[in-house]
C-alpha cells in the first residue's frame, strides 16, 4: 500500500504531465490556426491581384 506522500507524488506527476500535454496541444492548435489564416490571407491577396489584372485588360 503506497503511503500518502507517494500518492501525492503520483498525483502531482500525473497532473503535471497532463498540463504539459494540454500546453503542447494548445500550441499545436494555435500554430495550425495561424497557418490556415496566413494561407487564406495569401489566397485572398492573390485573388485580388488576379481581379485587378483582369479588370485592366
From Swiss-Prot:
Keyword field: Membrane, Mitochondrion, Mitochondrion outer membrane, Transmembrane, Transmembrane helix
Mitochondrial intermembrane domain ranges by topology: 1-14
Listed Pfam families: COX14
Predominant place of localization: mitochondrion
Membrane topology: Single-pass membrane protein
Cysteines paired by S-S bonds: none
Location of this chain's protein in the cell: Mitochondrion outer membrane
InterPro entries cross-referenced by the UniProt entry: COX14 (IPR029208)
Summary of the function given for this chain in its UniProt record: Core component of the MITRAC (mitochondrial translation regulation assembly intermediate of cytochrome c oxidase complex) complex, that regulates cytochrome c oxidase assembly. Requires for coordination of the early steps of cytochrome c oxidase assembly with the synthesis of MT-CO1.
Name of the protein in its database record: Cytochrome c oxidase assembly protein COX14
The organism of origin for this protein: Mus musculus
Biological classification of the source: Eukaryota, Metazoa, Chordata, Craniata, Vertebrata
Amino acid at each position: 500500500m503506497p503511503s500518502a506522500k507517494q500518492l501525492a507524488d503520483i498525483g502531482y506527476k500525473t497532473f503535471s504531465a497532463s498540463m504539459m500535454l494540454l500546453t503542447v496541444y494548445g500550441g499545436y492548435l494555435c500554430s495550425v490556426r495561424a497557418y490556415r489564416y496566413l494561407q487564406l490571407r495569401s489566397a485572398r491577396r492573390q485573388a485580388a491581384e488576379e481581379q485587378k489584372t483582369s479588370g485592366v485588360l
